[in-house]
Each structure stands twice: as C-alpha cells, then as structure tokens.
Amino acid sequence: YNVNLNLNDEAIYGEATSSSFDNKKIKRQNSASPRYMSDTPMEQTRANLPHWSQGETCIFVTFRLADSIPKEKRIQWGAERDEWMDKHPQPWDENTSIEYNERFGGKLEQWLDDGFGSCVLKDSCCREIIERALSYFDGQRYVLYAFVVMPNHVHVLFAPLAPHTMSTIIQSWKSFTARIMRKRIGGIGPFWQKESWDRLIRSESHFRYVANYIRNNPRKSNIPVYASETCAKICNWDDSMEKRLK
C-alpha cells in the first residue's frame, strides 16, 4: 500500500503549519487540567453507548473495525448491558460508572483480542496510516500519551486541548483514516464501528494502569504473529501528566 499521505489535502483534518509541530510546548489556561476533578461536573452524551468527558481530562478510548466482533456476541453483550442498565438508571455516580466499564468494557476487549474479522490493521502499511493520523495534531488539538494499533482495534490515551473536544477528535481520526483506508485497500460499507468505548482517567494510578495496558496489549493478543511485532507507541508513559505538560 502507498502511505505517502498528504494530510493537509483532507478537509476533515483542516490546515496545520509545520512550525506548529516544531514547538512542543503546550499552552493551557490556568483553569485547564488533564486530571479528573471529582468536584467538576462531567459531560455525558448517549447514543448506543454512554460517553463521558470533562474538559481537558485524560481519556482512554478504544475504537474498532466494523467486523471485529461476531454478530451473536454483539447481541449477547447488548442484551446483558441493557438488562444491567435497566437496573441502574442514569445519571450514574462514579462507582456505578466504574462498575459499568469493568463489567462490559473488559468483555469487549477480550473479544477484540481474540482477533475476529478481517484484522486489516495487522498490515504494517495500514498501521502506519493510523499511527500518522493519531500523531498529526499531537500538541495542537490534543496531548497524545500512548496508543497501540492492534489487528482489529486501536487504543488511545490522550487529553483534548480546548476548544477541541473528545467527540470531535475521535470522529476526525475515524473519518479521515476510514477514507484513506478505503482508497488503499478497497471494500464497501463502514470501516470503523460507529461508536467508541471511552473512560475518563481518574487518578495517576489509573493513568499508569492504562499506559501499561496499552504497552502490554500486543503480548496478550491471541494472534502470535502480530503479537511478536512492536506496535505500541508510548509517549513518556512513565512520567506524570504534569511533567509531560510543563
């Protein structure tokens, strides 16, 4: 595949000058913080999945290929989730949100690691398309802490930079890469599953846990050929968020 991407030609990514990427200093308003604030309201949106955001707080997001989970498992998962949600009406407190993520997020991630579907992202050229798109606006629209491109899904740990929001950033990644991938490999129909799975980072220990999860995810995959390759990109994963943002 040809991965000589001209990102500025894509309207979804807008315009960016090279000088903006030479300057790695990230300017924030005094009130902005990448840390979760327990006394600050969260913004919640809902489609098929609930989504939470809180300004520039760090987020762990997973988005997957449209064919990455078998239909029967999606139906099973959806039925179990709907039953649980009927017993836990929203809005949720912090503990209920954590329970939701542990109960249903863990199951999805295990199925993804089973390697179902076309798994086109195990091709090195396809991975490069995703990696370059994720890195392109690092420091301008978001701070990219860590990511890994797995055969059928992508994990990203990042913090939005105002005025950009979690939802618009994720949508731009998915829209742009879907368009490029369809040009490169063909095919019809959705490339990515419409919705993503996201979790707010609530503490530094949570941040470290997620960074390590991303780092180790290739080794835990049930696809030995791919798991042996180096595909995790960790940006200062052993530093605190404050140190990265100085």
Residue ranges and their predicted role:
Residues 1-246:
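Short catalytic/metal-binding and nucleic-acid-binding patches
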